Amino acid sequence: MKLSAELKSFQKRLGHQFNQPALLAQAVTHASMSTANRGDNQRMEFLGDRVLGLVMAEALLRLDNNATEGQLAPRFNALVRKETCADVAREIDLGAVLRLGRSEMLSGGRRKQALLGDAIEAVIAAVYQDAGFDAARALILRLWGDRVHEVEEDARDPKTALQEWAQARGLQPPRYEEVSRKGPDHAPIFTISVRISTGETDQATAGSKRQAEQAAAQALLAKLETSG
């Protein structure tokens, strides 16, 4: 099959020329757009998640020969969580080429964290099926970039620290809510609030939901530490 101009442009952003273009077409097709003659990316997302996990586990082991399983687990989780996958998807503007059904399109599907995270995993699976594990690994390490090297510092991030603070006091996990989203699709600004079960709350604004959640958690932690 021939790719559309949009998908050809996306191939360049991705840095992989597909030998089997149909794999890429399926990887960007959401279940809301699938038909009897055109599959969706759900099964590919399942495979891509496993390929991503293997690549990241291998990379972390190579970076730190002395790390324990307890140290590696939070680093691994930080690299493969949906927020990180969605951030990577945004960096290559994957949302612009997603094939969505009308209802999903109208509800802002191109910006949804879950859809973007699933789609980048499906794209990883497409590269794996098209060119093998080495090609998929090279793609992942290039797209994730410095995140792999910086994750050690971020393993115990403010969200994790706040959750541990709450658990140590027998409280429910903190709750995060989107207060507002402003700005254009390519440069959104999110305001996120966080609340713990004793009623304390704070909020923060940033260019991604994850960054805003982390900043809100940091602000609330600072407030809790000040109040004793």
Curated annotation (Swiss-Prot):
Residues 7-132 form the RNase III domain. GO terms for biological process: mRNA processing; regulation of gene expression; rRNA processing; tRNA processing. Residues 157-226 form the DRBM domain. It is found in: Cytoplasm. It comes from the Bacteria. InterPro entries: dsRBD_dom (IPR014720), RNase_III (IPR011907), RNase_III_dom (IPR000999), RNase_III_sf (IPR036389). Its cofactor is Mg(2+). Its main location: cytoplasm. Homodimer. Digests double-stranded RNA. Involved in the processing of primary rRNA transcript to yield the immediate precursors to the large and small rRNAs (23S and 16S). Processes some mRNAs, and tRNAs when they are encoded in the rRNA operon. Processes pre-crRNA and tracrRNA of type II CRISPR loci if present in the organism. This is Ribonuclease 3. The gene is rnc.
